[in-house]
Amino acid sequence: MQEKWWHNAVVYQVYPKSFMDSNGDGIGDLPGITSKLDYLAKLGITAIWLSPVYDSPMDDNGYDIADYQAIAAIFGTMEDMDQLIAEAKKRDIRIIMDLVVNHTSDEHAWFVEACENPDSPERDYYIWRDEPNDLESIFSGSAWEYDEKSGQYYLHFFSKKQPDHNWENEKLRQKIYEMMNFWIDKGIGGFRMDVIDMIGKIPDEKVVNNGPMLHPYLKEMNQATFGDKDLLTVGETWGATPEIAKLYSDPKGQELSMVFQFEHICLQYQEGQPKWHYQKELNIAKLKEIFNKWQTELGVEDGWNSLFWNNHDLPRIVSIWGNDQEYREKSAKAFAILLHLMRGTPYIYQGEEIGMTNYPFETLDQVEDIESLNYAREALEKGVPLEEIMDSIRVIGRDNARTPMQWDESKNAGFSTGQPWLAVNPNYEEINVQEALANPDSIFYTYQKLVQIRKENNWLIRADFELLDTADKVFAYIRKDGDRRFLVVANLSNEKQNFSVEGKVKSVLIENTVTQEAVEKQVLAPWDAFCVELAD
C-alpha cells in the first residue's frame, strides 16, 4: 500500500451554521470559521470537513442545494470561501467539501426547468413515475410527491424539497463531474460524499442502497475528477460491511479513499426499530465485536476506514454512551483514546474536543431539526405521549449536535452577538473553549496529543489489531508492529473493573489516569483509559 497524507490525518468536522458567527445575525458563517483557524491549528488537525455551504433554501440545513457553484448568503460569499481555503492552506489545513449529489433542492435550476418543461433534458435528471410504489422517505411518509403541472410523481428519499437525481442520465453525471472539478480547481482537499451509496438506486425494484451501478458510477467519477489528484474522498455508507468497504476503498479499485460505516453507531438504536426507539445502555460486548471485525477484516492493503463517534446527525457521544455528569471529562477522554489509536482516519466533530453535551430539550418549539419535527408530528398523531417524544429527541435528535459551539463564558457562549438560530446549551459557562485551553488537564489537550501521536507514529497505519479478552465493560486491544506492541485500555463504565497487564510497561503514550497505579493494583477506576508500549 502506498501511504497517503490522509493515513496520518485527523479531520475536524465544522457545521458552519453553528461554529462561529462573524456578523451578529445569529448564524455561523465562513468568515467566522476563518477567524478560528488558529484554534484549529493549535488542536493540530490536518483537514476540515465543511458541511454544505452552497446556495440553499435551507429546508434541510444546506443538504438541499439550489446551486452547487454559489455560496449561501447566510454563510458569506465566494470570496469568503476562497479566503477560507487560502488561510487554511497557510496553516497546513485542507478543506474537504461536503458533496451532496444524490439529490438537489427543488429550487435548483435543473428541477425548476424539469417541472416547467417536461420535454427538457433536465426532466430526466430526476426520477418521475406515473404512479408511486410504496417506497418511504427517510424523513417519514411516502418517497413520492405529486407534481400537478405534469401529472407525475417525483422521487425524494429525504424531504419533498429534495428530489433525487437520476444517475442513469449520462449528461447529469457529466454536469456533476464538471461541478466537482470547479471545486478541485479552487484548491480544496477532497470530498465527503453524502449518502453516496444511494446513487445506484433502482426505485422500481425497491433497490435503494448499493445498487448494481453504484461502483461503476464511482469509478467513472474517480476518472473524471479526483482520480489523479492527491485528495481525500470519503463516502457516507450506512449499509457497508467490511467486504463492501473494500469495493469503495481498495486503491486498486480506483473509487474512494475511505468510507464512513455506521455499524457501531447503530448500537444506539433498538434492532429493527426506528432510531427514536433508542437503546437505554451501550452493549459493550457488541461494540468490541464490531470494531474487532472492522479492524481485522478491512486489511491495510484492501482499503481504509474512518473512525468517529460524532457528527452533525448524531447525539453527543459523552451524553449517549459516556457520563456527561460526574465523569464527563474522563469519559470523553476514554472514548477518544479508545478510538484514535485504531487503524483508520479519525474525525472529530466540533465541540467534541471540549466535551460538549446533548441539549436539555423540554418543548417542541426549541427544536429546529426537520427529521425530529416530522417524527414528533407523526408520533403525536399516533397518540404517543409528548413526554415520550421529547425524551427521544433529547437523547437521539440531530439538534443535539447542532447547538452553537461554546467558545467562552460570555453571552451566547461567544458564538454570536445576535440571537443564535438554535439555543446555546445552558452549560456553556462551565464547558467552553476558553476554559479548556486554560486547563492543561482538559479534554482538548487529550485530543491535541492524540492528533500529535497520529502524525508522528506510522505504526498506527500498519500495526495489527488484536482484541483482548477482558471484563465485560473493559475494551482493550493490542496493536502489534514488528517487535513493538502497544496496549490500549478503556474502562467504559462508572464502576471499578479488574484488569491485569500481561508483560511490562515500557512507556506511557497517553492516559486519563495514573496508569502506573492502575497497572500495579490491577484495577481500573471508572472511565480509566490509557495507551502504553509494552517491553519486549
Task: Give the predicted meaning of each segment.
Residues 1-55, 82, 86-88, 345-348, ...:
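Carbohydrate-interacting/catalytic domains
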Residues 207, 211, 277-284, 325, ...:
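Hydrophobic alpha-helical scaffolding
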Residues 166, 317-330, 430-441:
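Active-site rim elements
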